[in-house]
Structures are given as structure tokens and as C-alpha cells.
Amino acid sequence: MALAVEKTSSGREYKVKDMSQADFGRLEIELAEVEMPGLMACRTEFGPSQPFKGAKITGSLHMTIQTAVLIETLTALGAEVRWCSCNIFSTQDHAAAAIARDSAAVFAWKGETLQEYWWCTERALDWGAGGGPDLIVDDGGDATLLIHEGVKAEEEYEKNGTIPDPTSTDNPEFQLVLGLIRDSLKVDPKRYHKMKTRLVGVSEETTTGVKRLYQMQATGTLLFPAINVNDSVTKSKFDNLYGCRHSLPDGLMRATDVMIAGKVGVVCGYGDVGKGCALALKAAGARVIVTEIDPICALQALMEGFQILTLEDVVSEADIFVTTTGNKDIIMVDHMRKMKNNAIVCNIGHFDNEIDMLGLENYPGVKRITIKPQTDRFVFPETNTGIIVLAEGRLMKLGCATGHPSFVMSCSFTNQVIAQLELWNERASGKYEKKVYVLPKHLDEKVAALHLGKLGAKLTKLSKDQADYISVPVEGPYKPAHYRY
């Protein structure tokens, strides 16, 4: 494809939309730093010892202002960094420009095609003749997936000379992945094996990527150690819940200017993300209906005052539909045909397969009207009524808005820094096998503690007698591993 890597005056590679936005990006990064006490504390604690000196880190995670603070924390600790976004719509171009100019190699811009997206992912993994990265910060697992699929293809090629055939799958995106690997084989038939050999491990940010890791662990195909950052309490119970409580109405209002009060909102799924979305719609005055498969989550929703029904029960009644499941085929084209005129359909899960966009786009006679970027109206011919789809069924909170605020992302990204440090510091110890791990409770509590002062909190201290009475150390951790919060 006709894309070329550019270089800064210092020789750093990049590909972003507009480098003239770098100064604007820097101003917003400086604002975000004040709201990200955990990351700034990591710089203070670890910066002088440069623990990442010599480490090459590849990131595949939304290239936002908040991520810029994460990247500059990694570089402040001594790492070299190459970065791409994990979603075609989520990059904030001024953030990408500032980091590309000042700190790290960035390959990301808002509105990438899928082909451009995978080109950027490949560039972020490309560390030249020395192989790939030492560490990966992943979000959704696409960088991890590319390496695993590359290794598998190279093994097949070595055994029987088979080259990946993009036409062997009906999935348009996976066709691009196979095409990349096919082209790579022609240049270096051991490229992904070299990456696998060098890799110390990956830390994974989100629920969807974690599911992929556990699937690979179960089948014995996981190629390197992984730390599940998503299931740190200070990630899933804060970013997923309170972050989505903030970002869902933000995205809805920026995209449509709709008044949420008085509307009927349907939240598909009531995990941590769904809980945040349902709370947000309720707080804005909507009547909220939840769809669920899990009786425990369903009962939780009922206890919060939400109604539990199936999508089929409410498809013609509701005004706003939000998918939060991390599963596929949640809202299908037959559902969308039955919706009210101008019902809003959006997804806040990681991938784009919760909403049947392929079925919608290929529906006979359907007319697509682009209102503005990432806001489209699809009109059905038989009724001449339409629905409004946000971010083409992808992650609406970053496609239509700017995602989660800096403070809650500081909790998540402090976990990422700690996970990366843990993998790197233990790289020669044998502590981590080719399995999926979570960070220990005392580190989870440390992340929380780093964020209390910013909010004016003052913790009560246990006496020695009190600590002994409940069988915990005076300084924690205070809860057993199985405690659910």
C-alpha cells in the first residue's frame, strides 16, 4: 500500500495525520498529567533508577492524550517505545503529533482504514534487524494476535511450503492479517519467530483481549507470559464502570445532541461496563432496560431498579441501544429493521462485531446518509424510516468523543506500568511461564492509594490489635484474593 514512514529531525520514525497539532497536544498532555497522579508517582519513584533502560516496548492502545502520559512515563523510566492505536477511530491526532515529535515512534491517526490500521500495527512491532519488542502493552490483543498468527504461518511454511491465503476466510479484517503475514514470509520467513523469541511478555488492558489470552492458555498456544491488567480491581471496577458512566453520555451527546431524559435506553450486558452505562442513562433521566444471559448479573440489575427483558421484547420500544457484552451478533439487522425512526444504535465494547454492520450495510436498498464523521443514518426502503449508528458499530466513546477522563485512566495505566515493570524485572527469574497472571493484591491497593490524595482522602489506620483481630497486616493487603469488591 502507498504509505511511507516519515522521520523527525532527530531520526525518529512516525506516521500521523498532522504534526502541526503537536503544540496543542502538548498543552493537553500537561493538563492531563495533573489529573494522573498514579503515573506521575511512578515517574518519581522509578525514574531515577531507569528500570526500563534497554527495553523496547511496543504499544497497541488508543493513542489519546491519556495514553500520551503513559507513553512518556515508560520513556521517563528508560524505555524505547513504538506505538499504534488499537482502533481505527480512537486516535486523538494532536496527542499522536505531540508524542511523535517529542517522545516515541507513533503510527496512528483518526479515521484509518482497516488496511492502514494493520500497517500501523506492523510498524509498531517493527524494531528493525534486531527483531521485535521486548514487551507489549496491548488493548484488545491485536498485536498479540498478529505475532501468534505469524508464528503459526511460519511453521506451516517451514513444514510444507504453505503460504497464507487471504481468500481462505470470509472475515475481511482477517484477510488483511493473512495478507500482511504472507508478504512478511517473502521477506523474512522467520520474522515472527524472532519476535516470539525476544518477547518477555505482554500486559493486556481490556476484557476482550484478556478473553483471547485465556483461550490461548487453555489450548496451550500462548507463546509468552501475559499479565491481565483488566482484572486488577483498580482497572475493572473503576475504568470499566466509572469511565463508561462518564463516556457513554458524552459520546451520545457529542454525536447526536439527543436529550436522554425521558427516553428508553437498552443496555445489552450488565458487566462492569454495562453497569456504568446503565447508571449513566438512569442519571440522565432515561428509563433503562437491561438484557442479560447471566442470572447473577440480571439479579444485580433488578436490585438497582432496572428491568430485565430480551432485546426482542423492547426492540420497537426503545430510543437508545448500547452493546457492552464483548460478544458477537448482539444487535442484528432484523432487530434494526424493527426499531423506531431515528433510534440510536451504538457499541461501547472493544470490537465491531456486537452490531451486525455487515448485514446492515448489505441490506437490499438500504440508504446510508453520513450526518458527520462517525454519525450515520441508515434508511430502510420498505418503511423510509431509519436508525442512527455511531462510530460504524465500533467503540463509540472514542469514535464520537474522547473516551474516559484522565483520572480514571491513571488508575488503569498505573497498573500497566507496574505490570510492565514486573515482567521486565523478572525476565530472567523464571517466575512467569507462558500463562496469564494478575497483579497481586498489595499492588492493586498501592495503585488505589496513589490516587487518594488527589481527591482529598485520608485513610483510617488500623492498630496492631485491630489488624491481628481480623488477621491482616497493618499496612495491608486488607482483602483476600477472592474478595469481589
Curated annotation (Swiss-Prot):
It catalyses: S-adenosyl-L-homocysteine + H2O = L-homocysteine + adenosine. GO terms for molecular function: adenosylhomocysteinase activity. Binds 1 NAD(+) per subunit. Substrate binds at residues 64, 139, 205, 235, 239. NCBIfam families: ahcY, PRK05476.2-3. The gene is SAHH. Pathway: Amino-acid biosynthesis; L-homocysteine biosynthesis; L-homocysteine from S-adenosyl-L-homocysteine: step 1/1. The lineage of its organism: Eukaryota, Viridiplantae, Streptophyta, Embryophyta, Tracheophyta. Its EC number is 3.13.2.1. Adenosylhomocysteine is a competitive inhibitor of S-adenosyl-L-methionine-dependent methyl transferase reactions; therefore adenosylhomocysteinase may play a key role in the control of methylations via regulation of the intracellular concentration of adenosylhomocysteine. Homotetramer. Keywords: Hydrolase, NAD, One-carbon metabolism. It comes from the Eukaryota. Pfam families: AdoHcyase, AdoHcyase_NAD. Belongs to the adenosylhomocysteinase family. NAD(+) binds at residues 206-208, 240, 269-274, 292, 327, 348-350. One of its GO terms (cellular component) is cytosol. Its cofactor is NAD(+). This is Adenosylhomocysteinase. It is an enzyme of class 3 (hydrolase). Gene3D superfamilies: Adenosylhomocysteinase-like, NAD(P)-binding Rossmann-like Domain. One of its GO terms (biological process) is one-carbon metabolic process.
